[in-house]
Curated annotation (Swiss-Prot):
GO terms for cellular component: cytoplasm. This is Chaperone protein HtpG. Signal peptide: none annotated. One of its GO terms (molecular function) is ATP hydrolysis activity. HAMAP family: HSP90.
Amino acid sequence: MSETVERHEFGAEVGRLLDLVVHALYSDREIFLRELVANAADATDRRRFEALTNEALALPSDARVLIAPDKAARTLTISDAGIGMSKEDLAQNLGTIARSGTRAFSQALGERAAEGGEDQRPSLIGQFGVGFYSAFMVADRVTVTSRRAGSEEAWTWASDGKGSYTLEPASREQPGTDIVLHMKEDADEYLESYRLDHVVRKWADNIAVPIAIRDAEGKEEAANRGTALWRKPKSEITEEQYKEFYRTVSHGFDEPWATLHWRAEGALEFTGLLFVPSMKPFMPMEDDRRSKVRLHVRRMFITDEAELLPNWLRFVHGVVDTDDLPLNVSREMLQSTPTLQKIRRAVTTRVINELSSRSKNAEKAEEYQKFFENFGPVLKEGIYEDFERRGEIAPLLRFRSSTEGGWTSLPEYVARMKPEQEAIYYLVADDVEALKNSAQLEGFRARGVEVLLLSDHVDAFWPEQLGKFEDKPLRSVTQGSADLAKLKPEGETAEAAPALDTLVAALKLALEPDVSDVRTTDRLVDSAVVLATSGMGPDLQMQRLLRRAGRGFGGSAPILEINPRHALIRSLNERAEAGEDLKAEAGTLLDLARVQDGDTPRDPVAFARAVAAALAGTAAKPAESA
């Protein structure tokens, strides 16, 4: 055996990519430990697999991944008892990028399976050989000493990551690998046992291979639980274990409202363990719209940014683990491979099916209503954002109603519609109580027509996107003159409305350009006026939201509708026919309609004065008649 140290240049691809890997590819420095632990776990898994056909390669009983910081020497060592590497392996796997031994082994294993050989497949993750180089984010020099299982020779690979590496003979008592990182000055935190423990529990808690951390006194502490709960059969998992795992992944204190645990098999294989919380999070869900489902590949946590569920299901927490996903160059920058897209679709379908099943369970209707109170506003976002899924989401929604005391659904609403009723009517405002007392509902109540009351922040957006449900159009009661002509008022026959042509003309003239039209309406009973839109654009609530956001609204002004049977309107009509100037009264009517709809008067001071004057006139009448 030659004692000469061999110096080699990195492969051309390494020279080009090493700087990228170290400085740009990884967005979080702590990922270096995930990569090195993953490699060590892979090596251990590979030796266990090869020992199935070669007993001489059997793992020692205490096989583990050991992480040992040394503050005095400023080194961090990651050791394993895995398959190890020969001199050729070190040169091939660490001297070139994207050619790891694990990837070559997976290819060889696939060839063996195609030939009808062993069908057992170890969980191997390092399909791209860039993870090792992340060590140079925290180390200015790395040495790797390894002995291949079944061989007596050991070799040391060393590099400062600047274009070359050395190989020299070494000694190692048992097969396996030691990676020694000579830490940079700004990486002291990774010489602290508590920091290492935190990183391991975050990124590798469910790796099957035991992981231990050795402290300064030489004491070893287990750093991972080593069992991927989602990989166990449901029959072997207790309810308490599910709850504990849910609290771990959600950082919550409640119990899961729903637990989904399944194994997808066939052309696409993955395991899912998902939870729907029973409580809303303390922080508003609008602040963080990312999916809360973690992606694992062969038990190893890859990322929580794979968007495995759409934003409108972001209240769901959990894990999806697959053996079939081809990893891209870096795990935290995993791109949308076709396999991942299929997994997303399958996981989303599973969650929707679960919610659909629970929404139809009449015996547990109150439980579903509680869920909807917690997460309904988020679910509604799916109508606006997900064209493909709108038809599946709509039946899951629940609403307050002008006629029902509790919650109702779109299917239930349609089942109660009057035979001559053409549309599903809804009204949007900021507050449910304001909705219940809205003048917009008077004509509908008089005819026994149900109106859905919408008060969530997203309710101004999604109804127009849904458009219709079961071939019934959704129509805001503020959008144009709702067609109530076919619906007779219940009870007494409606009094014939007087002609108000003179008043209508006077109001139009006085209110231009603040209104686009003035017209009489049969949808008011107790109120004198109400606002409407033309029906060709956003409803009134959407227009208000646009104004609050400073975006304005380029459409037409609202329509002022007046109640021809109201005493105030009749009185104003008489004054209009007598030729009086009604400009001030017209402005007060418009502001009154705005206030009724939860908006502000155009000029609050002028409106207050008008109201005060009207009250003063009312108070003076008894004195005048005395």
